[in-house]
Amino acid sequence: MNRRVHVLLGAVAIAAGIGTVRAAQAYKGSETFDAAWTIIRDSHFDPAMNGVDWPAVKAELGPRAARAQSDGELRDVIRDMLGRLGLSHFALIPSGRDNGAAAPVDLGGDPGFDVRLAGSELLVTEVDPNGGAAAAGVRPGWRLLSIDGMPIYELLSRLPETMSDRLRHVEIWRMVETRLRGPQGSQVPLMFDDGVRGVGLVVERRAETGQPATVGNLPTMYVRVDAGERRTPRGATVGVIRFNVWMPAVDPLFQDAIDKLRTADGIIVDLRGNPGGLAAMIMGISGHFLRERTPLGTMKTRDADLRFAANPRLVNAAGQRVEPYAGPLAILVDAMTGSASECFAGGMQALGRARVFGQTSMGQALPAFFAKLPNGDVLIHATGDFVTADGTRLEGRGVVPDEAIALSRADLLSGRDATLAAALKWIDQQGR
């Protein structure tokens, strides 16, 4: 499944708590709060702190941090501080559970399906054929009703009414994911609506597949690249490449896929559910589709502007001269497409090199770094802002598809991928 710094972290940061939670540390209230406040003051890309009176925030929240009686209380104060900025990529990775329990919680087992919010319904959008959910009979389009007795409507009720739809998608995914996961080999009771009736199943959590990769203090991620061919309604051959995170292990696999698809009538890069990763990789991946060194966007920091440009890939893995792919290029995105994925999709869209299909992406496109705090927690803090070559700021906006395709339960239940179908139809039209 598609789950889960130079540097763009994206929803990889959202998934940061989805792994093994380590034993708790002493909370060190004032020292930890002051360290986090100072790091942000000194590194925020906007000296005006996005319009927030930063000293006033310290004056208000500092005493609360000093009075904190547990790690959980301290984290609540720091998260309150981070929330005042109104930006993504400011977060905490706890060194232990908020309740102070010392026993580690293993969240390395995955039930093998993914979900998205459609209105007030949480729908299964994808099922791993090798996962526990597939073995139990779960199908795309089913509505998830409860996890281990916890009703989904109760989780949704915890979201603030003022929260934007874009953030609701991200937050409910995070809340659900942390409950779906658990130790490998364990089981989780789930209730679904299959479109006709309620279905209760017990699903085994299995080990994730893919090439393990680690970044900083984040849990291990598993890199997966899938590539194959599809036929358009008119019989054209289209290559479809999908990967789940921007990590170095993707590059040789992506290049191999491109080498096999150079004669295709079109290529689709599927970034649905891809939360981001290493920002610098967008320069190399885009170079498979651009002949010249072309600006993709600019990362604006407090001290400098870092320009991202496509690095044309003119030699293949065998050392042979090649031309970047010049045919039609479609990019698929959804509500869980974040960070580096947004920079790539938005950058290629702004250049007119790709057409984007799907649902508006996360709008969480800030570059971020890690800093260890005195209590052992890790602060994720944004240090720059990214704008595409045409000046479009992706933070808080997301990549808006050229062709918006609403998530439909009827499509999912029938096995139809409407976003992919729209991209295939468009590629057909380019061959006229």
Question: Where are the regions that the model predicts?
Answer:
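Cleft-lining beta-strand/loop regions that shape enzyme active-site pockets
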Residues: G182-P374, L412, W426-Q430
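N-terminal export leaders
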Residues: R3-L8
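PDZ domains, with a preference for the canonical peptide-binding region formed by the helix
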Residues: R67-E73, P140-P189, P252-Q255, M281, ...
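Conserved PDZ fold ligand-binding element
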Residues: A135-R166, I241, I268-R272, V356, ...
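PDZ/PDZ-like domain segments forming the peptide/carboxylate-binding groove
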Residues: P104-E154, M247-P248, G384-D385
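Extended, small/polar residue-biased N-terminal targeting/export presequences
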Residues: A48-S120, P183-E229, G431-R432
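Terminal peptide-recognition signature
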Residues: A36, M81, F113, A133, ...
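Mature N-terminal segment immediately following signal peptide/propeptide cleavage
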Residues: A26-G51
